[in-house]
From Swiss-Prot:
Keywords in alphabetical order: Cell membrane, Disulfide bond, Glycoprotein, Immunoglobulin domain, Membrane, Receptor, Signal, Transmembrane, Transmembrane helix
GO cellular component: cell surface; plasma membrane
Assembly mode: Interacts with CD276 and this interaction enhances T-cell activation.
GO-annotated biological processes: T cell activation
Key word Cytoplasm present: no
Protein name per its UniProtKB record: Trem-like transcript 2 protein
Disulfide feature: 46-110, 61-68
Organism expressing this protein natively: Mus musculus
Residue ranges of the TM segments: 271-291
Functional description taken from the UniProt entry: Cell surface receptor that may play a role in the innate and adaptive immune response. Acts as a counter-receptor for CD276 and interaction with CD276 on T-cells enhances T-cell activation.
This protein's record includes keyword Signal: yes
Signal peptide boundaries: 1-24
Amino acid sequence: MEPWPLTFLLLLLLLLWLQGCVSGHSNENLYRKVWRREGETLSVQCSYKNRRNLVEAKSWCKVKKKKCDHNFTRSWVRGPSYSLRDDAKVKVVRITMEALRVQDSGRYWCMRNTAGHFYPLVGFQLEVYPALTTERNVPHTHLTNTPMDGFVTTGQVHISDPHAPFTSDVTMFTSEVTMFTSGLLTLASGTTTPTPVTGYSFIDTSGTVTEPERNTESQPATLSPSNARSFSADPVTTSTMSRHQSSSLSTTGTCHPLTPNRSQETYIPAMVVVLTFLPAPVVLVVAYGFWKKRHMGRYNLGSNYAKPWIHLPEGPETPWKPAWSKITQ
């Protein structure tokens, strides 16, 4: 067996495999993706403007086990499972499904009925997510035991530690012993992240700077009279500072930027290019094989071409007689 038929078969199998991959992705593109949450209503439209002015019934079905069920039921809904309205003037079908649940997730088809045969118009892929049961309530911050004669000072605190990649802008409400603080952490890259300071006190220690976790409860920060300092509008330098809480997170690490996720569909154009240009060399190889076999042919010396030459035994030469000798005789 010559090598070029084997190559042709391998390329043919490769083409079939690539065609299967492309057809699989094309089936996904047939459906329009729709996302809803439980309790919401689905309302979609199917257009049939390219159809002639024929009276055709419309239907809405759900794909189950590679079949489209036109009589699917939704037991938790009172009345019909869906409503379908056909506007013949604008040639648009409107389908509505109320009280969605996670069980409604799946693939649906809007079809037309022509003489008992169903033909698809538009496909939809519905994804229903669970409803949000709890909502996050942010409590309001209340200042307790704040005298009326309190004053507000703002300033910028520079941390002397060279490894700390941020500075802290502090806004402080002070009145004798009780005060309230709130600040912003400014990263070295220029990004500001709000970090409310609640539920702990400032203590002078000789450690590193740690950032505590956020506390959902709003409590006023207290400072003992012995450690209370008056902040002026000008920046002041503090040697070391730590924030103590039940669980804390060190901020002396290095920030690594997240790399964006690449799209998973970038290989589709490459596959289309391969399918476009791959058949050309295959056809050229096959055509060259047939042309070579037809025009150049094969040369065979026969079955006796390998036998040695046979030399006949040489006998004594007969004497030469001229032709006129026969006449004289």
